[in-house]
């Protein structure tokens, strides 16, 4: 039993080091996982086939806002811009995806692939800012 205790304390030591690396992980997530608000754009389509067409356009190099204007069924904002959204103001799967994405720009968007399914339909999401 004492060796187990020793390895347990060894684990605690490692745990201390791991917590150090946890803070490093949190710093590494800074551009990705942190913050309480994200500036989001999305493309929303009810039909899977249509969202996949939009995905192909994005992959071929078409700008995100142009694809959103052409394909998105969410007419609330042109270009798919939802503005700043806070944690808790988005549906679960959309929020998880939005906070997992790195910040990117129109020229080289990083977006959800495959699209995210919610009760509203299928979303391709990109994040333009985080705070």
Swiss-Prot record:
Coiled coil: none annotated. Isoform 2 is much more stable than isoform 1 (at protein level). Ubiquitous. Isoform 1 and isoform 2 are expressed in kidney, liver, blood vessel, brain, mammary gland, skeletal muscle, small intestine and submandibularis. Isoform 1 transcripts are much more abundant than isoform 2 in each tissue analyzed. The modification Phosphoserine is found at residue 19. Residues 7-18 have a biased composition (Gly residues). Pfam families: Rotamase_3 (PF13616). GO terms for cellular component: chromosome; cytoplasm; mitochondrial matrix; nucleolus; nucleoplasm; nucleus; preribosome; spindle. Belongs to the PpiC/parvulin rotamase family. PIN4 subfamily. This is Peptidyl-prolyl cis-trans isomerase NIMA-interacting 4. It comes from Homo sapiens (Human). The gene is PIN4.
